[in-house]
């Protein structure tokens, strides 16, 4: 491609509303242009990268024998009403009516559609297992779209769906897709982790997220330094601590704590550390109006874990202070588990404390030297807390460490959630109708592009991994407009590299060298070749890698093989 015939428009200034590096650099390099809130046009340069992502994904999906199809973006409301998600999916579902007042949504995902198709197409166990995928535009009505294409309202996604009759078959396909995702991100040159994750609104029995590691990532990931264990903050657990091996010999004592309402205030007032206290949170229950959740004072409640407890209402709902005072006759800052006449669920780390300070269920009063069993009873012990840096890994191997990531893929073992709701069944080997079970496998095509930039950039611009770069090589002829020798040699080099199937940009614009070099660094082309009269006199071409500040001279007759070897490494 010749730059003079290419739409190459770069910007020196960083747009004011671009908060993170990928958003800034995608705008400055001319990859995208904003149309509206969370809506972006992919310009020619950006589209080249997007297509490379799609091609890698498509190749690896095809290797798993998944079959590509394309489903409508607009979906009838009846399908979503069958599964109950029309009401529960929330405000991110963009709904509309046609001229006949029939309701539709612009699909954020396609579980209902694929299940509807397959319940009509699949009749026998002989047709299973099957796996279908599509690469398609989705829409989620984000309240606050931000970070460019990282959290846009319209985005491109690869979503795949598999159908099975046995858990064993589902697990086999799940493993194949998991490995395909690993190959995809390996080929893209990205540093990533596959982490255990909550199934969220999609549902199912098991799931893994694929997180591209980046300091700007919104997700917290915990991983072991001595094993393969990794999970996001919602799912991460630590090794369960043993119960206190020594009984508390101190007498429980009621003390005054005037106007001390928070854990930090109580701990400071009593001259103790916050990890010597416990806190009691009152939430809505499933069968009981209120349920108490008890954690060590220095721990944070993990709301996702809490909602999985059978006694806790989902979504999690905290009881307001006025209702607590009216029902429990205790102000919020003085609540504790002793003689609390509602179900009490205690976190394992709180249960491991030999003694603790807790609210006394009287205004401005706390107990010190309280102990479980002797003084405080509980209904269940459960993992309620967010893990912390330095916690022991749940597999007993190593310690947990924290990093940040950007979720770019998510695979789920759905089970029969959608098939059961939509009566998707086939005849099994015994001649009986059996509900199918499903897996689903999502990968954010547009988000991968932004995540790659977040992981691969410097103060000058993007540093593309070779597999994703819009062009692999940039040839810059210095003063090509005035030097026929430079122009001809650059053209010859351009044609030779093209003949070997290499993506080459010949930057033949009539610009100063500084502008051409700066644009190359901004766009992030991995390999730069500079053709100049001075170097040609020595029979050389100047080479520079985007990852290095050093340049080197390559003999003219060796430069093509030199580039081919670099690209094939």
Swiss-Prot record:
Its subcellular locations are: Cytoplasm
Task: State whether keyword Plastid applies.
Answer: no
Sorted keywords for this record are: Aminoacyl-tRNA synthetase, ATP-binding, Cytoplasm, Ligase, Nucleotide-binding, Protein biosynthesis
Q: What is a single cellular component term in the Gene Ontology annotation?
A: cytosol
Molecular-function GO term, any one: aminoacyl-tRNA deacylase activity
GO BP field:
prolyl-tRNA aminoacylation
By its UniProt entry, which PROSITE patterns does this protein fall under?
A: AA_TRNA_LIGASE_II
Catalysed reaction, written as an equation: tRNA(Pro) + L-proline + ATP = L-prolyl-tRNA(Pro) + AMP + diphosphate
Give the family this protein belongs to, as stated in its UniProt record.
Answer: Belongs to the class-II aminoacyl-tRNA synthetase family. ProS type 1 subfamily.
Functionally, this protein is described as follows: Catalyzes the attachment of proline to tRNA(Pro) in a two-step reaction: proline is first activated by ATP to form Pro-AMP and then transferred to the acceptor end of tRNA(Pro). As ProRS can inadvertently accommodate and process non-cognate amino acids such as alanine and cysteine, to avoid such errors it has two additional distinct editing activities against alanine. One activity is designated as 'pretransfer' editing and involves the tRNA(Pro)-independent hydrolysis of activated Ala-AMP.
Q: Which PANTHER family match?
A: MITOCHONDRIAL RIBOSOME PROTEIN L39/PROLYL-TRNA LIGASE FAMILY MEMBER, PROLINE--TRNA LIGASE
Quote the protein name from its UniProt record: Proline--tRNA ligase
Q: Which organism is it from?
A: Legionella pneumophila (strain Corby)
Q: What is the lineage of its organism?
A: Bacteria, Pseudomonadati, Pseudomonadota, Gammaproteobacteria, Legionellales
């Amino acid at each position: 491609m010749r730059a003079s015939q290419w739409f190459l428009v770069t910007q020196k200034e960083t747009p004011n509303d671009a908060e993170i590096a990928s958003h800034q650099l995608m705008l400055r390099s001319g990859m995208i242009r904003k149309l509206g809130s969370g809506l972006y046009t992919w310009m020619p340069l950006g589209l080249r990268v997007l297509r490379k992502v799609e091609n890698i994904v498509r190749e690896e999906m095809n290797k798993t024998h998944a079959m590509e199809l394309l489903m409508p973006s607009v979906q009838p409301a009846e399908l979503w009403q069958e599964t109950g998600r029309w009401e529960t999916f929330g405000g991110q579902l963009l709904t509309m009516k046609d001229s006949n007042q029939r309701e539709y949504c612009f699909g954020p995902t396609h579980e209902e559609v694929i299940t509807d198709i397959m319940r009509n197409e699949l009749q026998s166990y002989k047709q299973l297992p099957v796996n279908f995928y599509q690469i398609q535009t989705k829409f989620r009505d984000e309240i606050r779209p931000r970070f460019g294409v990282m959290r846009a309202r319209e985005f491109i996604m690869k979503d795949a769906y598999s159908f099975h009759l046995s858990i064993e078959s589902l697990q086999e396909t799940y493993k194949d897709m998991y490995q395909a995702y690993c190959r995809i991100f390996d080929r893209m040159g990205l540093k990533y982790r596959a982490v255990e994750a909550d199934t969220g609104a999609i549902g199912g029995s098991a799931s893994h997220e694929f997180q591209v590691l980046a300091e700007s990532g919104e997700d917290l990931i915990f991983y072991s330094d001595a094993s393969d264990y990794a999970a996001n903050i919602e799912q991460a657990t630590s090794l369960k601590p043993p119960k206190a091996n020594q009984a508390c010999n101190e007498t429980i004592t009621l003390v005054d704590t005037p106007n001390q309402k928070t854990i930090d205030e109580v701990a400071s007032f009593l001259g103790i550390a916050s990890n010597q206290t416990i806190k009691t949170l009152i939430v809505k229950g499933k069968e009981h109006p209120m349920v108490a959740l008890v954690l060590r004072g220095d721990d944070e409640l993990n709301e996702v874990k809490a909602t999985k407890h059978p006694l806790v209402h989902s979504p999690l709902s905290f009881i307001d202070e006025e209702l607590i005072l009216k029902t429990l006759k205790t102000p919020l800052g003085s609540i504790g588990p002793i003689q609390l006449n509602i179900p009490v669920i205690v976190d394992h780390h709180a249960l491991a404390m030999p003694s603790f300070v807790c609210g006394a269920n009287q205004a401005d009063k706390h107990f010190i030297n309280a102990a479980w069993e002797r003084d405080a009873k509980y209904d269940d012990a459960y993992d309620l807390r967010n893990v912390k840096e330095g916690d022991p890994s749940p597999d007993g191997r190593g310690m947990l460490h924290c990093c940040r990531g950007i979720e770019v893929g998510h695979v789920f073992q759905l089970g029969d959630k959608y098939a059961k709701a939509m009566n998707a069944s086939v005849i099994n080997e015994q001649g009986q109708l059996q509900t199918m079970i499903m897996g689903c496998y999502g990968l954010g095509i547009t988000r991968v592009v932004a995540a790659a930039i977040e992981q691969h950039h410097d103060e000058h611009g993007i540093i593309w991994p070779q597999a994703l770069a819009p062009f692999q090589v940039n040839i810059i002829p210095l003063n090509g407009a005035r030097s026929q020798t430079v122009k001809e040699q650059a053209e010859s080099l351009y044609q030779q590299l093209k003949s070997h199937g290499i993506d080459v940009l010949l930057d033949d614009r009539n610009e100063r060298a500084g502008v051409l070099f700066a644009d190359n660094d901004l766009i992030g082309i991995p390999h730069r070749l500079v053709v100049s009269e001075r170097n040609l006199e020595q029979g050389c071409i100047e080479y520079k890698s985007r990852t290095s500040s050093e340049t080197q001279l390559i003999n003219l007759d060796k430069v093509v093989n030199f580039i081919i070897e670099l690209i094939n490494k």
